[in-house]
A protein has these predicted regions:
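An alpha-helical, amphipathic repeat domain used for nucleic-acid recognition
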Residues: 1-162
């Protein structure tokens, strides 16, 4: 079968009751942002007032909570993927999370643990990478930490201590 045969398949339409049940299950499985839920409903031909009504019901029944999503997302990305604050903020903004929820999510990252993780990332990268000279080393370590979303001033301070 060709890959394109699957891309033309349409998602089945949901009735209101099916949409509510399926989206509640979708939200109960893991925390979701409003954008993901909205996209899922639109995928199944739920639009306009019905879409807004379903989202409103999800919020009032605690199936959808933007702040809890943001906090969970930040904790998970920091602990599992060792992302820095900048990358986490950027991803939350892409998902249309409010500034208030992003600020709340940043409180989930302990300052001491944050510095420790950055230090460990730099040490591991230093062990596994070859460098031509000190300038090359500084550039590669800085680029790596920036790509993980860490702040430049913290990176420069850590590299300066090495």
């Amino acid at each position: 079968m060709a890959k394109d045969e699957f891309s033309d398949k349409k998602k089945p339409y949901w009735s209101k009751d099916e949409a509510v049940a399926n989206i509640q299950r979708y939200c109960a499985f893991q925390e979701r942002c409003h954008k993901e839920v909205r996209y899922k409903l639109i995928e199944h031909a739920i639009y306009g007032d019905l879409l807004e009504e379903i989202i409103s019901d999800l919020i009032s029944n605690n199936f959808l909570d933007e702040e809890i999503f943001a906090r969970t997302f930040a904790r998970g990305k920091f602990r599992m993927k060792q992302w820095g604050r900048n990358k986490i903020k950027q991803e939350l903004k892409i998902r249309d999370v409010s500034a208030y929820s992003i600020k709340a999510a940043m409180t989930e990252i302990d300052g001491g643990e944050y510095l420790s993780v950055l230090s460990n990332l730099l040490a591991k990268k230093e062990r596994t990478t070859t460098f031509k000279n000190q300038l090359d080393k500084k550039k590669k370590l800085t680029d790596y930490a920036l790509s993980k979303g860490y702040e430049y001033d913290l990176i420069a301070e850590m590299i300066g201590k090495r």
